[in-house]
């Protein structure tokens, strides 16, 4: 017990287990009820029977009428009511002090953990707060039980007070009980003062009952807030951790797949090729496309060669041209907006113009071959 003695620890324990409404009720009961009964009620009711006068000389009639008027002395009834209402609170306080002293003697280490009670060990009250390094035990269950008993006792004594005395003290009380002959009128001393005192104690009893209900509601709400959640076993924690890792791994894999399957931007797909570039390379065929100027030069050179050779040879060369066949067989993977140039096999060389100077030359070479 660091810095707090046994008496201080017991006071702190009792203070932490009693609500503010309960403390107000205790002050109300001790000051407005017990002190008023002892200091104001005793002088008013000490000579009550002596001053209870009846208009008859019949022996025993006054005693019988007084017994009917007041079966129980008002002063004694109020004292019994106050003691009975205070009894549950006194029992609860003694229980808290006893348990607090026992826990302080055992020490904080010898008390087992309430969340994991071991077999064969005495279970200690669950701690809910710390004051000066000490764990204050929780006695909220006992406090709620004592509130229920106190409220029931308050209601029972209030009903009994109404059936015995009513709300006001009458000035004249008629009596017809034997041995009285006929109707006998009896007179009460200080009826106004007694009526005021009875009304005051009625108000104190009603206020005590309402405070008991409010204290019960506050105690139930505080206990619900302090109630801990169900303890999680190590196996459940491991399963939850494994499932969390699996979900994280699955999320990472899905993110990687999305990154791999994401389409490239149009600028990266073009690879630096402009729309007006003279040379564009096809990704599938691997051949270099020839611009329009180069195609015209090739066409003119091919026509000149065909003009120098016999007419039957160009057809064989055109049929054996590997470039034309390769371009027709291999599919092109370029975009549709890029138009493929005409192949060389589709070029038909024009017929050479017949000239007068070329005919004698051909006849001379033919004569040499023969």
Curated annotation (Swiss-Prot):
GO terms for biological process: cell-cell signaling; regulation of satellite cell activation involved in skeletal muscle regeneration. Residues 246-260 have a biased composition (Basic and acidic residues). It is a multi-pass membrane protein. Residues 1-19, 98-146, 218-370 are cytoplasmic. GO terms for cellular component: connexin complex. Residues 224-370 are annotated as: Disordered. The keyword Signal does not apply. The chain crosses the membrane at residues 20-40, 77-97, 147-167, 197-217. Expressed in pancreas, kidney, skeletal muscle, liver, placenta, and heart. Pfam families: Connexin (PF00029). InterPro entries: Connexin, Connexin_CCC, Connexin_CS, Connexin_N, Connexin_N_sf. Its main location: membrane. One of its GO terms (molecular function) is gap junction channel activity. It is found in: Cell membrane; Cell junction, Gap junction. Keywords: Cell junction, Cell membrane, Gap junction, Membrane, Transmembrane, Transmembrane helix. PANTHER family: CONNEXIN, GAP JUNCTION DELTA-4 PROTEIN. A connexon is composed of a hexamer of connexins. One gap junction consists of a cluster of closely packed pairs of transmembrane channels, the connexons, through which materials of low MW diffuse from one cell to a neighboring cell. This is Gap junction delta-4 protein. It comes from Homo sapiens (Human). The gene is GJD4.
